[in-house]
Amino acid sequence: MSFNDSNLEGQIGEEMYINYLKDKNIEFFDVREDLQCQWMDIDFIIPSNNHTKEEILKEVKHAKPNTRATRQKEIGYTVEVKLDKVTHNRFKKHNGEITEGTGNLVYELISHNMPGCLARSYADFILYVCVDNFGSETILKKAYMINLYKWRQAMVNTGKYNTQHIVLKPTKYVKENNKLVEENILNILHPVKDLLTVEGAVKDLTDTFMKYFPKNINI
């Protein structure tokens, strides 16, 4: 199986999560094709106590983020899946040394001149899937389930995350209506090791998800 563009790349992590949910007989709504959920950047809804998709989305959209945690067991929660190819990849430097990726999670503030997917997401949790290429096959390196509210709080509350951790990629020019326009991308780089120290912010679920990762793929 070969995934050749960014949309298909993202489906790798989504397929892994679906395999897990089905194997564990966990009820879920696949809302990736739902226009409202695309706008809210939500991929999956895990309901509780027979609540409907509409009931959960209404609460997610209007409830205060700091109250959501107390309601998730009662009504359900939402998940967005993100694929990352740089956090834990292994690459050779010019001198032959092997380096273990960047060690940073990427929080997208601006992408394609719009709010980034994580900046605008209403998801309760981000399944952050880190992959690497091993020979001709793409393999799972790490899978983190991140509480998005606590991730945002960690970035706000920690003095470390100042301008030196905000990376503006070189301006690119894209064609819109036959005119070249600037395309800006703005990210916050957040070290994994720092987020792992924030209570309740992230769980390393690599061992749990390893057997559900799609086989024989190359991106």
Describe every region a protein language model picked out.
Residues P65-Q72, N113, V131-I219:
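Non-catalytic C-terminal interaction segments of nucleic acid-processing enzymes
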Residues R71-E74, K85-A119:
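Mg2+/Mn2+-dependent nuclease catalytic core
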Residues V106-L140:
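Aromatic- and glycine-enriched beta-alpha-beta binding-site module
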